[in-house]
Regions:
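Bacterial N-terminal signal peptides that target proteins for export
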Residues: 15-26
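Bacterial N-terminal signal peptides
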Residues: 25-34
């Protein structure tokens, strides 16, 4: 065979090998994409429904009776974050398998970071017990309440709550999720002794706000500083429904691009305690209502260790953070949705849609 013919044959083989390689890589990409898709976590509503059913199935009759409430029960709105007597079924009465199912339910309602915060807050109760010796300080005094009947296409809700923790979810039509009020608190805000010394469960919420405050120029700071004295607690407390607070603070539109980025990062810190789908929905609503309508306000001292409070408020939402009690080592923080706490906006849309059709399936 002549050298020119040999060269031509080799070129043909080279082209065929390249084609086979390209085809194989393409198949691999498709395969990996398929695997990634099939391994994606289920949507929050579906995940919560599945894990709630599994959790309820683990309970005995007495526990299930304590955990279940009608969807239209007034108890659904009776949320709080202080160490008080609560309804529901507590971790304290659960077996190890029941506890595992209960915490799986919490995982389904929060992001990984949100779940870590919730568990860290619960474990702080052990530190308080060691400091105070009071039985009310107990990491097992966290309660579960289920409102209505979890199921595909159903409207129902649930709450996970104890000292410094209140997470409230409403699932409408088995698909839409509302996840507020959302409360996280810490005492101590910074652990100063023992094996967990230096732990600051809500440290990012404070540090980023301080970074924003420190970046303000004199004019911006004059708008942002609402008072030299911080309130003793978040202003909305545990109210069932909240309206906008005074429209005060420095406006997002008056911030530089780098300051706006810090402000948005703080908002994300609170929003992303929820699963990605819910968090993105929250953030989309914030954007749609207009970023320039958001204001940041500060009360109290600007130095670390001084009592302080801040809030971030837009047309649809309110973030409050207060650290005044316990020598400014005791944090309360909350995300409120003016229209959507306890799923009010989702339920209103649902009822309007079905006003002349079938009644809502709330598992009654």
């Amino acid at each position: 065979m002549h050298s020119r013919e040999v060269s031509s044959v080799r070129e043909d083989y080279r082209e065929k090998d390249m084609a086979r390689t390209t085809f194989n890589i393409g198949c691999l990409v498709v395969l990996l994409g398929t695997i990634a898709y099939t391994q994606q976590a289920p949507e929050p509503a579906s995940a919560m429904t599945t894990t709630a059913i599994k959790f309820l199935d683990t309970l005995n009759d007495e526990q299930e009776s304590a955990a279940r409430f009608a969807f239209d029960s007034e108890d659904r709105f009776d949320w709080h974050f202080i160490p008080r007597e609560r309804k529901g079924v507590p971790l304290k009465t659960m077996t190890s398998s029941q506890r595992s199912a209960a915490l799986d339910l919490v995982r389904s309602g929060l992001s990984e970071d949100g779940f870590t915060k919730a568990e860290s807050i619960r474990q702080l109760e052990q530190i308080l017990f060691e400091l105070e010796g009071r039985d009310i300080r107990d990491p097992d005094l966290y309660f579960f309440m289920v409102f209505g009947e979890p199921g595909d296409g159903n409207t129902w809700g649930w709450r996970y709550e104890g000292h410094h923790l209140s997470q409230n979810w409403t699932i409408v039509n088995g698909t839409a999720v509302a996840a507020s009020p959302q409360f996280f608190g810490t005492n101590p805000a910074e652990v100063r002794d023992g094996p967990k010394r230096g732990q600051r469960v809500l440290g990012s919420e404070e540090d980023q706000a301080r970074s924003l405050l420190a970046s303000l120029n004199a004019s911006q700071r004059a708008s942002a500083m609402l008072s030299d004295e911080a309130p003793r607690d978040i202003l909305t407390s545990s109210e069932r429904e909240v309206a906008m607070l005074d429209d005060l603070g420095v406006s997002q539109s008056d911030l530089t691009s780098s300051q706006q980025a810090i402000l948005w990062s703080i908002i994300e810190e609170y929003a992303t305690a929820q699963p990605a789908t819910v968090a993105n929905q929250r953030l989309d609503e914030v954007r749609e209502a207009g970023l320039t309508n958001i204001k940041f306000g500060w009360m109290g001292g600007a130095e670390r260790g001084e009592p302080h409070y801040y809030r971030i408020q837009g047309p649809t939402f309110l973030i409050e953070y207060d650290n005044t009690q316990g020598n400014a080592n005791h944090v309360h923080s909350v995300w409120r949705d003016f229209r959507g706490d306890f799923g009010r906006d989702l339920l209103a849309m649902h009822y309007r849609r079905f006003q002349h059709d079938e009644p809502v399936n709330a598992g009654e």
